[in-house]
């Protein structure tokens, strides 16, 4: 019986047997769809605001890093909870799984207090660092105060989504994002422009629509969590904060917070370098909204590729592991090539969606073409980073993330702005991405001579 079970087992898991391209697409498409919805959330706000007032668009471009920081804290902590809950469920330790989920909701309060204080006291100084234009500062204050002071909805929604995912439920978290995004898209024009019974509220209206979308997403998630989910139960009845549970959550969660915060720090740095031109700051803001449509599918792809590489590494199937890496890179490059072609062929139309002024158009068109040269090397770099995570080389993936988004790009951008002017800053993107890819290839070659070399031995 034992032998029979062993002979059957390899056929049970599709990750070891299914044709590779089909397997990658099957595992990646739900994540790609989910990530694209998140990208849509960001872009819709900006399109409506840009068509309402160019100063409003500049203000929300400057506000964007703080929104990213909020998501980094919320999602990073939630990743820690997800890891803890899924491990305890695997161990059949349901009491600790429930306790972990309850701790997760309590950490939402910690995170919320941080961003409530930022919303109340830090918004004006933050906006004033970048611009003396009072209209932009005031729009930024309106937008950020609402988004940060009501961030509890977003923080709880992200936590509950990740907790549901820990139980293997991928569909409802995706639906909650979709529901929130649709509500946001409906209320954005109504509240910004004042359509029908709604007053014209401009940038403030965009903030309210965003928060209302997050509130609806949170309510949807909580309803599923409390009424449709039988795996994990939250109870505050005899709840006590447990230091070792919190430690287990943050051991995984804190590095994830750091990884996700890097992008926020990078944009704050680039905004400071570009501060000599409001139009350049706006162009960077528009670029980041649009590039999320290209990068988010790639991040969705890596969520599908990671377990495939990890599984085949564990099963010592070197050929399949390399096949997953190769096909992952090819699919990633195809996604990024489409993005590059669009940035080269229709930059004017892309910028015009945001109601771009002539000034923004003059800076934005060449900027988009230059920056998009980084897309294809970035695709390969992202999949290599996924490989390092999948085979347990987390430090290499952390080094890669730091290099891509901080260590290389900011010094290069600063030097280019000093030697030439702010219009040369855009070249920092492809230069940094190219060197990051070289580093990734060096790491990979090192692994092929070390850890991966021994994978053949058991097969033969």
Segments predicted by a language model, with ranges:
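Residue-level signal for short hydrophobic patches within transmembrane helices
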Residues: 17, 21-40, 44, 66-73, ...
């Amino acid at each position: 019986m034992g032998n029979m079970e062993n002979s059957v087992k390899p056929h049970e898991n599709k990750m070891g047997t299914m044709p590779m391209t089909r397997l990658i697409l099957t595992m990646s498409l739900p994540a790609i769809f989910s990530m694209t919805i998140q990208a849509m959330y960001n872009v819709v706000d900006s399109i409506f605001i840009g068509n309402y007032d160019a100063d409003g668009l500049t203000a929300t471009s400057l506000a964007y890093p703080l929104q990213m920081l909020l998501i980094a804290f919320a999602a990073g902590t939630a990743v820690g909870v997800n890891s803890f809950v899924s491990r305890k469920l695997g161990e059949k330790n349901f009491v600790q799984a429930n306790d972990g989920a309850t701790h997760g909701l309590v950490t939402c309060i910690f995170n919320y207090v941080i961003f409530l204080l930022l919303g109340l006291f830090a918004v004006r100084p933050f906006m004033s660092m970048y611009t003396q234009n009072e209209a932009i500062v005031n729009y930024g204050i309106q937008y950020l105060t609402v988004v940060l002071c009501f961030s509890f909805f977003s923080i709880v929604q992200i936590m509950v989504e990740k907790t549901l995912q820990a139980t293997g439920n991928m569909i409802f978290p995706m639906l909650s994002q979709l529901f929130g995004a649709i509500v946001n898209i409906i209320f954005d024009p109504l509240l910004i422009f004042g359509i029908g019974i709604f007053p014209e509220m401009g940038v403030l209206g965009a903030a309210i629509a965003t928060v209302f979308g997050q509130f609806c997403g949170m309510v949807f998630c909580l309803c599923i969590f409390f009424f449709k989910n039988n795996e994990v139960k939250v109870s505050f009845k005899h709840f006590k904060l447990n230091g070792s549970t919190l430690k287990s959550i943050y051991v995984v969660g804190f590095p994830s917070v750091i990884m996700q915060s890097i992008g926020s720090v990078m944009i704050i740095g680039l905004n400071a370098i570009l501060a000599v031109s409001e139009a350049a700051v706006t162009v960077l803001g528009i670029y980041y909204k649009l590039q999320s449509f290209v990068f988010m599918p790639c991040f969705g792809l890596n969520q599908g590729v990671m377990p495939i590489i990890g599984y085949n590494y564990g099963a010592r199937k070197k050929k399949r592991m390399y096949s997953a890496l190769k096909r992952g890179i090819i699919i990633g490059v195809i996604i990024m090539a489409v993005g590059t072609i669009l940035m080269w062929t229709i930059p004017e139309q892309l910028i015009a969606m945001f109601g771009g002024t002539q000034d923004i158009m003059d800076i934005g068109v060449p900027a988009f073409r230059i920056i998009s040269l980084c897309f294809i090397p970035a695709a390969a770099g992202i999949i290599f980073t996924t490989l390092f995570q999948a085979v347990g080389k987390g430090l290499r993936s952390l080094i890669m993330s730091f290099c891509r988004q901080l260590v290389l790009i900011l010094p290069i951008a600063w030097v280019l702005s000093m030697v030439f002017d702010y219009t040369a800053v855009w070249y920092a993107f492809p230069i940094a991405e190219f060197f990051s890819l070289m580093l990734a290839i060096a790491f990979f070659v090192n692994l092929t001579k070390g850890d991966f070399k021994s994978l053949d031995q058991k097969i033969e």
